[in-house]
Swiss-Prot record:
Domain PLAT: 48-158
Complex and partners: Interacts with EULS3 (via N-terminus).
Alphabetized Gene3D superfamilies for the sequence: PLAT/LH2 domain (2.60.60.20)
Protein name: Embryo-specific protein ATS3B
GO cellular component: extracellular region; plant-type vacuole; plastid
Residues bearing glycans: N37
Function: May play a role during embryo development.
Keywords, sorted A to Z: Glycoprotein, Secreted, Signal
CDD domains from the UniProt entry: PLAT (cd00113)
PANTHER family, A to Z: EMBRYO-SPECIFIC PROTEIN ATS3B, PLAT DOMAIN-CONTAINING PROTEIN
Ribosomal protein recorded as keyword: no
Span of the signal peptide: 1-24
Tissues showing expression: Expressed in roots, rosette leaves, stems, cauline leaves and flowers.
Length: 190
């Protein structure tokens, strides 16, 4: 009976640890990209199409005159830059709305970062940025916060790729240890 209790305690421990590590990686807030430079964006190789859906928060102003640009890419230096997505005549980035953009750029692997650039007086607030790319799963970046003026602001999970490998190795070890306890517990029960 004690081994069964130990077994369930270990399962709970592994679940709690893996969930807290996962949440800390996924829920990092957006940040100012101090070293991000658009002039470093590559325009070499094949061209691929991307669908970018930017939803504006219901907390944002009713409409915006702000100039909005987006840059995104993968962990291998493949970057896409789209200047001036805003267009007041077509009512882009209105409060509680979603705007879809077709953007062409270098082909990438899995998108792992996105930055928005805002310039203007209105203080636009994006809700989410969702990017669909060729051959990769769609990725959503949850903003729901004010984008500071005249800085690149967003998410960079590219450096987390190695963290996910560490997490996978750690979980694999936990499963092996857990299986060891199961075998030991089963042996004790026999």
């Amino acid at each position: 009976m004690a081994s069964v209790r130990l077994f369930f305690t270990l399962i709970s421990f592994v679940f709690i640890i893996s969930t807290s590590v996962y949440e800390s990686k996924v829920l990092d807030p957006p940040h100012v990209a101090e070293s991000f430079n658009v002039s470093l964006i590559q325009k070499l190789g094949n061209t691929c199409a991307y669908t970018v859906i930017i939803s504006t928060s219901c907390s944002s102003t009713r409409y915006t005159r702000d100039q909005i640009s987006v840059a995104f890419g993968d962990g291998y230096g493949n970057q896409i830059y789209a200047p001036r997505l805003d267009d007041p005549s077509t009512k882009t980035f209105e409060q509680c709305s979603s705007d879809t953009f077709q953007i062409n750029g270098p082909c990438t692997y899995q998108i792992c970062y996105v930055y928005l650039y805002r310039s203007g007086p209105d203080g636009w607030i994006p809700n989410t940025v969702k990017i669909y790319s060729h051959g990769s799963k769609a990725v959503t970046f949850p903003y729901n916060t004010y984008v500071p003026e005249s800085v690149w602001y967003g998410f960079n999970y590219c450096n987390s790729a190695s963290d996910s490998n560490v997490l996978a190795i750690g979980l694999r070890r936990s499963v092996i240890i857990l299986l060891g306890f199961v075998v030991a517990g089963t042996t004790l029960l026999l």
